[in-house]
């Protein structure tokens, strides 16, 4: 079983959870079920993004919801952002920044 880690900014904000919590109860439950399947190694509909270190988990409900993540060491899945098809480019750009921040802070903590 894989561990899921959710990105948190330096000031303690969690963009993914803020996005997920903005969804209806039905969609929150469906997102949580999908994340549970990811923990079990069952990713479903996903792809690596071009020109990015991120991958995109495509959800077949709502407004074309997407979850952006990075698998690290084949164990930890870092969930960095969520959004829908209408704001996809902006969300990916921001998720790339979040991933860079996460990796930089992780490197700093290793020293």
Task: List where the protein language model places each region.
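Solvent-exposed, charged helical/coil patches
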Residues: 1-36
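Enriched for short, Lys/Arg-rich terminal
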Residues: 1-9, 28, 43, 62-66, ...
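Beta-strand-connecting loop/turn residues
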Residues: 12, 52-53, 74-75
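Short, electropositive, low-hydrophobicity segments enriched in small/polar residues
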Residues: 16, 45-48, 86
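Alpha-helix boundary/capping residues
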Residues: 23, 35-38, 95, 102
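A short, surface-exposed loop/turn module that caps and links secondary-structure elements
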Residues: 33-59, 109-111
